Amino acid sequence: KLGDQRQIDIASWNTFDFGGVXKANANTGIGNVVIERTDNPNTVPYIPA
C-alpha cells in the first residue's frame, strides 16, 4: 500500500529486470519491493499492487 516501507533481505531477491523500464522487482516473503534505478532519467515512480 502507499507509504508502506519494509526492510528486505537482499538474498531473497529473485527477479531483476533492468531492461527498458529499468526496474528491479524484488519478490520477498514480506512483500513486493521495487528498486528504482537513479541513473535513468526516464524511470518513473512505481507503486506495487
Swiss-Prot record:
Source species, domain of life: Eukaryota
A GO term from the CC aspect: extracellular region
Primary subcellular site in the record, as a coarse category: secreted
Compartmental location: Secreted
Keyword Secreted attributed: yes
Record's keyword terms, sorted: Secreted, Toxin
GO molecular function, one term: toxin activity
Additional note from the record: Negative results: does not show any hemagglutinating or hemolytic activity against rabbit erythrocytes. Does not show antimicrobial activity against both Gram-positive and -negative bacteria.
Its biological purpose: Very potent toxin that exhibits a wide range of toxicities over various organisms and cells including brine shrimp larvae (Artemia salina), sea hare eggs (Aplysia kurodai), mice, and cultured mammalian cells. A SOR-containing fraction cleaves plasmid DNA in a bivalent metal ion dependent manner suggesting genotoxicity of SOR.
Record-given protein name: Soritesidine
Native organism: Spongosorites sp. (strain QM G324170) (Okinawan marine Sponge)
